[in-house]
């Protein structure tokens, strides 16, 4: 059986899905994180391990194409290095793309559209007339508003604000501090500065649950971040010269685990766009391999 492999490598985990040529899923597996800017060696090893598990079961010779979507590969020569290492390990044709570009292909193929992504990080990828461009996606130091990491950091900024002013902790602060196992200066700093972004972003569900249960501070954070994501989408719309109807896709755990943030995002778009439709389905970026194979 001939098949294709798509890999969506993220800051928290990497997802591999193999498809037969009709688009049916024939193998799935989750592996370790894949961000070369964080750790190139671990990223390559995680990807090779995932592919090896798949080819061991389905046969290496039957695989026609592997597409890998990964954050930061447009920086330096990461894409070239990953392609070299993975092709060297398996002898299979490899396409390495920025994760947002690959996800956009999975949603729209070659059609025009804007994909807003909010997971550990955040970005927009917009394509029009066959040309794509990233908007946002500058990372946690320069941006990432609306991301799981940024949302959690906003909550921790409130915590340290309260500590410095001898203010009582609110309910959200208490839940977050209980989760990290401490409330002292050293314990908070150890958690924030001693963990990768993915570990910090993993606390996002606490804030999402708080908002769903009526916690006003949690809701305020998510409302603000939903508006930030909408502003990024509107920036992408204007930058690419859209003037009429547009299709917008939303992807990532932040959108799909917070009804409040998602609704705020849609409400903001409705204020500024005359006509748009939303693809709310959380489509796996791995499906882009089907589109890429069809172009060969």
List PLM regions with ranges.
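ATP-binding/phosphotransfer module of carbohydrate and carboxylate kinases, centering on a glycine-rich
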Residues: 1-62, 85, 90, 107-114, ...
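Phosphate-binding/catalytic loop of phosphoryl-transfer enzymes
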Residues: 73-169
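Short hydrophobic interaction/assembly module
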Residues: 56-60, 66-76
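Broad gene-expression machinery/nucleic-acid interaction feature
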Residues: 13, 65, 121
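Solvent-exposed, flexible loop/coil residues
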Residues: 40, 67, 77, 139, ...
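Glycine-rich beta-strand-to-loop/alpha-helix junction loops that act as flexible
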Residues: 67-72, 118-120, 246-255
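Structural motif
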Residues: 69, 95-97, 279-281
